[in-house]
Amino acid sequence: MEVSRRKAPPRPPRPAAPLPLLAYLLALAAPGRGADEPVWRSEQAIGAIAASQEDGVFVASGSCLDQLDYSLEHSLSRLYRDQAGNCTEPVSLAPPARPRPGSSFSKLLLPYREGAAGLGGLLLTGWTFDRGACEVRPLGNLSRNSLRNGTEVVSCHPQGSTAGVVYRAGRNNRWYLAVAATYVLPEPETASRCNPAASDHDTAIALKDTEGRSLATQELGRLKLCEGAGSLHFVDAFLWNGSIYFPYYPYNYTSGAATGWPSMARIAQSTEVLFQGQASLDCGHGHPDGRRLLLSSSLVEALDVWAGVFSAAAGEGQERRSPTTTALCLFRMSEIQARAKRVSWDFKTAESHCKEGDQPERVQPIASSTLIHSDLTSVYGTVVMNRTVLFLGTGDGQLLKVILGENLTSNCPEVIYEIKEETPVFYKLVPDPVKNIYIYLTAGKEVRRIRVANCNKHKSCSECLTATDPHCGWCHSLQRCTFQGDCVHSENLENWLDISSGAKKCPKIQIIRSSKEKTTVTMVGSFSPRHSKCMVKNVDSSRELCQNKSQPNRTCTCSIPTRATYKDVSVVNVMFSFGSWNLSDRFNFTNCSSLKECPACVETGCAWCKSARRCIHPFTACDPSDYERNQEQCPVAVEKTSGGGRPKENKGNRTNQALQVFYIKSIEPQKVSTLGKSNVIVTGANFTRASNITMILKGTSTCDKDVIQVSHVLNDTHMKFSLPSSRKEMKDVCIQFDGGNCSSVGSLSYIALPHCSLIFPATTWISGGQNITMMGRNFDVIDNLIISHELKGNINVSEYCVATYCGFLAPSLKSSKVRTNVTVKLRVQDTYLDCGTLQYREDPRFTGYRVESEVDTELEVKIQKENDNFNISKKDIEITLFHGENGQLNCSFENITRNQDLTTILCKIKGIKTASTIANSSKKVRVKLGNLELYVEQESVPSTWYFLIVLPVLLVIVIFAAVGVTRHKSKELSRKQSQQLELLESELRKEIRDGFAELQMDKLDVVDSFGTVPFLDYKHFALRTFFPESGGFTHIFTEDMHNRDANDKNESLTALDALICNKSFLVTVIHTLEKQKNFSVKDRCLFASFLTIALQTKLVYLTSILEVLTRDLMEQCSNMQPKLMLRRTESVVEKLLTNWMSVCLSGFLRETVGEPFYLLVTTLNQKINKGPVDVITCKALYTLNEDWLLWQVPEFSTVALNVVFEKIPENESADVCRNISVNVLDCDTIGQAKEKIFQAFLSKNGSPYGLQLNEIGLELQMGTRQKELLDIDSSSVILEDGITKLNTIGHYEISNGSTIKVFKKIANFTSDVEYSDDHCHLILPDSEAFQDVQGKRHRGKHKFKVKEMYLTKLLSTKVAIHSVLEKLFRSIWSLPNSRAPFAIKYFFDFLDAQAENKKITDPDVVHIWKTNSLPLRFWVNILKNPQFVFDIKKTPHIDGCLSVIAQAFMDAFSLTEQQLGKEAPTNKLLYAKDIPTYKEEVKSYYKAIRDLPPLSSSEMEEFLTQESKKHENEFNEEVALTEIYKYIVKYFDEILNKLERERGLEEAQKQLLHVKVLFDEKKKCKWM
């Protein structure tokens, strides 16, 4: 692992010297141990973390990746790898043992290429998704698309391991990823899900090219596993001295055990995998089974040392753990490199095969630095000020700090942070790359930014510097131990001391007897300010004894003369001032004479007389004057060996005797809090025979042992110890008797203080006795549980506690007020911890009970009580039933049911013989609820029972009355139904007779002189066919092309035009686009239409493309169902075929089919308008479609009008006939009458009137009076619910021969009115159909309308248009002059040839292909959409009728025989008799085309060339090319990848890249 170190940011210029108050405030503001550290929390457990040198911190949790700023206070961006946009976490099998990282979706998180010249930083992420995919993204923002990605790079199993490192190698300095992963796991359910390709099944280490698009594996880029190697769990990957190292250990994922020793694999830092060997790592010292699990790894590069955390534990829980379970071991990299021989133990290469017995050499750690601990999880190492600093994470949420000595000797770790929740620390610790005083601590779902030292805990300069913490130093201006960055002007060496200075350089005030006549007060240390002041003051009298100023660059000194008057000075205050800060000290001379040692005497400011060996007042003299000047000159005392400290090792007979006599059995408790324990009991034998008994506690191997004297030997088998406070850890315990060997007791765990998370229930009754449960952790170290009440004080409560649970009975507070709150407290040693609040409320109130007996051997007792908030459980309640004189039965609690008013408690008494007797006897019920005991009164008979007696009598009376009323109503209903049936029969007879008569007698006079057929020009015909649903393209494609310069086409479009004329390229692009999931059916149709327009003048080339794509489509369909080919428009070629047919058949459509088609539409319109048409719904009496049948029609009649047209400037011709007779219906609205009048004018004069419908009005001429006719006016009928009925001719009572004047409106014109649901015409609202809206003679008419009565109208309409329809059909499937259109003949021959090539012998297949390509794909589209061909407006009703005609047309081409019954839809039945005739004609049509002589290629090319010339400059081809490029650039990477894989398209690939450059430059120019 490579750790970058940045220089500290430039500091601001030095300000003026701050005041002492400011220095004090700065000291308060500096962060301390208790400050809240910033925490970032995720939704799921964190699986990976990395810090970038410039772009913040990256954290992977579940399926999410977050980018945070360095302070963890702001989230910069987030990436969701789950398609649903959730941060899900893996649902793994049984949770793995804690010494190993658990399941995670994230496998790699590697920032790289940071700071490279001219290159931006990148982030490589590896996930289990998509078979172990890796992505490369820019470091700046995760939301940007990935630059490169590849599959099968990392392990795709959430439990599997992955380690990797990115480096540069080769001549071109390309970036490579060396990755080691557990690609295959033994679990069958996961193996089938995401195993890699067979060639990668035994891959252990792979080399990937990160600059390739798919992160492809190098040709020599795999290192394989030996057959018997099993699964390897890789922990880390790092670079050192030109090699890549992978620490790992063999691991059985099924059993959860390590199957071999941890090892280190080594490969060369090269462009291919060059295996350089492996070496085993032995960190098993101090553990009987060895430590075979490798938990964490860190390379201390500056020291060329690798640190690892090893573990022997294989399961969860303290019962599987011991004080020696884990260890920190340091290995010299040079030794690992020397011993990593190329043995084939776990890995095989091409040169060497796996050999049994060829074991790797074992490397031993640096013994002095090995640190043994009970529960380490992670390590990170670095070098600060030439000191090696190691940070260690633990399983109980601690962050430890170890500082190695000169010989790499580990000191006792310092706890620099503890997680309150005790979450295990993540296996990877990450330093802050910007500020090296921080480290990121990850645990569970949280990341914290922690300061790397607690400098402020050192209160003095000497304490600060003797702690040897390289992060800390003494700040003179603040008089505190701080980080250098927290000290003002720390760059000034006079203001800052680090550990290299040593404690001797700390500033210190000393009082020295310089001579017999005077005493000197001075300051020693490394501090030499330019100017200083000093002053000595008598504290008792506030008198100054001395005051002085220093000479430049010299320390101030104060001389006090030796006077008899100064003997009474007991306390002096000495102060040195240095401009911005002061140094002061107080000396007390009261006890000088009591001090017996020279160092202690001189330290307090007293004077030591050498010859007399006594301590005196400093302002008096020795006799003779033989005092020591300072502490350094005191004689060195020889230390005596004390009884404490380390236990003596006595190997004499006493030891052997102790081993034979004394016996240790157990220690209780085995867990104590960090506060210690005053009564720990050790059990065994023969304790009273020993005189000196000590307990020795040994925790972390590099820390001092605790030696504790026995407190009290209780008897021969029990003794008591009082344990001191300690940090959280597990310790070995042994007992030493009389200086003999230490007998092991086992282990003892120091754990954190208890923590409460829940009290349930939180409300109880005042009498107490309810079972209360507390949830939390570390409850097994509680001494007492106390209820604290404001009146009753502290109440000790009996409790039962385990680690996470504590139960107790709520005490009674009966004498207190009814509603009160108490505090639950936990006592640990002499410390009280608040656990929460317990609410007391008044006792429950019981209202009664009842006893029921459904079975003779069982009684049910139901007790009612008032509703309350007590959560009563089965353990809280006891119910007893007393019956007879002495009978007593216990009732078993069943459940409690809470109702709206009362709560019911149900209990049952089972196994009795006389249940019914007991239920009817005298009885009472006793309820004991905790401490509450009471008798419940039996429920009284409610008054409702009397009501239940009267109820049956009333019920009988009501029933008889109801029967009488019902019979009367039934008779009335039968009479009305008979009348209605008679009326309905009469109506049916009339309608059937009228329908029959109309069918036989009706005749439609088709107007043949319909004038010129209003054909659309080719341009609009083509666009409506190409884009039936996209009207927005009409304008951009039809701009004036004649004024455009042909040479004006820009270079990018010219290049693209040339590129799509490359057939292989274009076909490849189309196939690639169709494989994209988000390339929808709409996109395919649009792309085909854009391509048709772009190649409109290159129809020969377009036809060749159509041929290739059709053949490819045949290849796809021939393997599945060939009859389905071309049936739907789901591919580009199908829409392309539609467009091609439209282009090639446009002339045939205009010359042959257009006129009969227009005649059909006109005839159909005439027939529809002959009968009533509802304006609102567009339904009509005469129709071909049952869904559009107006069967709610009233009686109607024809009204002949004499219409007079006003002379207008738009139509002043003298030849125009202005008096016209027009027939309308009395049920027509005024708007419908206008349309018929306009149509009559057009038919009479051959030209339109000159105005639009909304520009004219109608006036009824009544003598000298006129009345304007409107659809809605003041006389309109308003129905219920505010619905307005539109005015009709009948509404105005206009009779035959009435004169109507057509005039031009003067007011502003309005567009055609779209009537809302608030209006109606012929179809009335349901509630109105029962009312008489047209007079009494029509009463009830609407009520009995039946749809089937009017089905003959469908047949009548069919007969009216039949001859016109057949003329149209035969114009389509006939061959004028015995010649088929070129396009049809060519494509049908093409289909015949392809069928023959593919050996398709079924003639039905070819018939279906032809039907799908011509009638279905072209003619049906035209028949249903006349507005594609003519300049007319298609109404919804016409659309419904044309759908029936189009269906009949397609049925004529179908090969299946129609099996129609009486229940078949009318749309099918209408042309059922005609279809067989049509089918025969179609077969003859197909045969005639096939029998025609084939077209030569030159004929077809000539035809296509002529068609191309016809349509030159019809469309704006540049727009089409631009739209095509949008699709190409959207899927640019996919197209480019496809071109790379296809042979022969290298030139096309270059052209495509050139086109993209041209378009990109054009885009840049637009912004300039």
Swiss-Prot record:
Compartments where located: Membrane
Segments crossing the lipid bilayer: 945-965
Topology within the bilayer: Single-pass type I membrane protein
GO biological process, one term: regulation of cell shape
Disulfide bond sites: 64-87, 156-194, 226-354, 283-329, 455-472, 461-506, 464-481, 475-487
Gene Ontology MF annotations: semaphorin receptor activity; signaling receptor binding
Domain Sema: 35-452
Entry annotated with the keyword Membrane: yes
Modifications made to the protein after synthesis: N-glycosylated.
Keywords of the record: Disulfide bond, Glycoprotein, Membrane, Phosphoprotein, Receptor, Signal, Transmembrane, Transmembrane helix
Protein function: Receptor for SEMA7A, for smallpox semaphorin A39R, vaccinia virus semaphorin A39R and for herpesvirus Sema protein. Binding of semaphorins triggers cellular responses leading to the rearrangement of the cytoskeleton and to secretion of IL6 and IL8.
Subunit structure: Monomer. Homodimer. Interacts with SEMA7A.
Protein name: Plexin-C1
Species: Homo sapiens (Human)
Lineage of the species this protein comes from: Eukaryota, Metazoa, Chordata, Craniata, Vertebrata
Protein encoded by which gene: PLXNC1
